[in-house]
Amino acid sequence: MAKKEININNYNDDAIQVLEGLNAVRKRPGMYIGSTDGNGLHHMVWEIVDNAVDEALSGFGSQIDVTINKDGSLSVEDQGRGMPTGMHAMGKPTVEVIFTVLHAGGKFGQGGYKTSGGLHGVGSSVVNALSSWLEVEITRDGAVYKQRFEDGGKPVTTLEKIGSAPKSKTGTKVTFMPDPTIFSTTDFKFNTIAERIKESAFLLKDVTLTLTDLRKEEDNHVAFHYENGVQDFVEYLNEDKETLTPVLYFSGESDGFQVEVAMQYNDGYSDNILSFVNNVRTKDGGTHETGLKTAITKAMNDYARKTGLLKEKDKNLEGSDYREGLSAVLSILVPEAHLQFEGQTKDKLGSPLARPVVDSIVSDKLTFFLMENGELASNLIRKAIKARDAREAARKARDESRNGKKSKKDKGLLSGKLTPAQSKNPKKNELYLVEGDSAGGSAKQGRDRKFQAILPLRGKVLNTEKANMSDILKNEEINTMIYTIGAGVGADFSVEDANYDKIIIMTDADTDGAHIQTLLLTFFYRYMRPLVEAGHVYIALPPLYKMSKGKGKKEEVAYAWTDSELEELRRTFGRGATLQRYKGLGEMNADQLWETTMNPETRTLIRVTIDDLARAERRVSVLMGDKAAPRRQWIEDNVKFTLEESGAF
């Protein structure tokens, strides 16, 4: 993405605006970083990295370095202009204002940035508030300055000059230690950070981003630099897929908006569009993504009409038909004056002008490409027509399910399989997808019949990564799930119509169980993704061990889910205890299954989330796709094989 020209002199103490004081961040951290688990911890990293990215985006600096230090703290260093070091109108050093006052930053006025991705400047102060300590080091105007904060953002030193530097050298380095009294974990994950900064490197093609982990001596450094930017990003997304087209690249500028699009078709059956605004991922899309989809649909339908692939009596194909098998990256720079997000987060762009700008640029250039590449274009239209036929079959299936018009075959699918809940309240009901008939029987007996439904999975679950929609609808197990959930499938899926609040996958704690989990998650990811994104899909966690001692009424019973918990039970029970290793769910009776795995008061559920769409896309493609080599490599790198089954995955 081309960089905006900005006057370096505009980024000074007067450019820092203050909207409100920093209040209650420590009391309600979830309002600012989403959560206090590992996701919230890494959100702190993104806030500081995004500020460094804003500097690079504005044309200042060619490298950003992220370092996980030996003591567990984390540093982000950029080559930007360096934060202003003078006094602010509030009577404090400007740096102190930036790190202690919420919404203090250079992104509200018209001088500091024309485009920015940081959360309107709140990031630095929020990170400071949620840290045990934070240090900022600034290189600017031939000098090096430093200030330290402790105990949730309290300045313990003033901004002081600690050295000199060449006048040509500028930048900011922020180091912080997350507060263990706030976060459930303070362990930074190397791979999580690497994937995120890799994404930023794709979008900043003139900038190198590095990550170093000083906690270990080997395999502790990665560097990312991509000369072709978003084109390289799309190639990365499709790396483990069979592609049908070269990477198409379109760019343009209008009304101060800069647009870049890279897209490529593969032989898969789902689409994967990643959109960004000012280098920040907009996972819920928005007006810019709508413009892209509209442009693709219009250009393709117009071409199909002109070439006779769609006859006069035929209806236009829908956008989802043309997006089947499409991987695309849309990156747009929006001027600060036009930047609007929907809601409190940056997940969805609301800027009205973005839609026509993207639509116009992509429509014109895609139309030209189609006319110049007739054979390829015709193949894409034929592929879309097949997608339409599959979509209409899926819609028919959903309508029949919703209206209760199941065929004899479909009624037979559910007959003797689904044990429904008594309640008809979709906001409270739970559906357990249970591996095998024996476990299904125990689950039926042990459940709370008021709100828990049981669907045993008897046959083989289809690998939907390798199947088209017609094959999916022919698979008995998948078809039964579609009818039971009741919200359609594929492009026609509507999460609001789901019959259950929780879809819970319950399998044995062995390799077969893990395989079934993976097959089901692949199906939900590809064909009911909104169900996952809305947090409705869970994995049940049955215990691995049962330890008992004594008999009759004096019998003591306890369960362990991990080997460390087992060792604790050994110490607690002492000699004379009996240990049972559960090989499968069927070994538990109904009461045990209820107590350990189904009772909302005592069970443990893992909610399935998609934190990084690009990473999830690659993982599904590698593990479930056609290419064996990358799957074998991933297993060798990530799975430890032992002689004794451990139940750890």
Kindly give the residue locations of the regions a language model identified.
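Residues immediately C-terminal
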Residues: D54-E55, G82-M83, T511-D512
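Conserved short strand/loop->alpha-helix "switch" segment adjacent to the catalytic nucleotide/phosphoryl-transfer site
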Residues: K27-W46
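GHKL-family ATPase ATP-binding module
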Residues: A2-D14, L22, W46, D54-A56, ...
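Short conserved segment of the HATPase_c
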Residues: R26, M83-G105
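C-terminal interaction appendages of subunits in large macromolecular complexes
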Residues: D389-L413, N425-E430, G441, Q445-R447, ...
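Conserved ATPase-coupling elements of RecA-like P-loop NTPase cores
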Residues: S58-F60, T85-H88, K444, I516
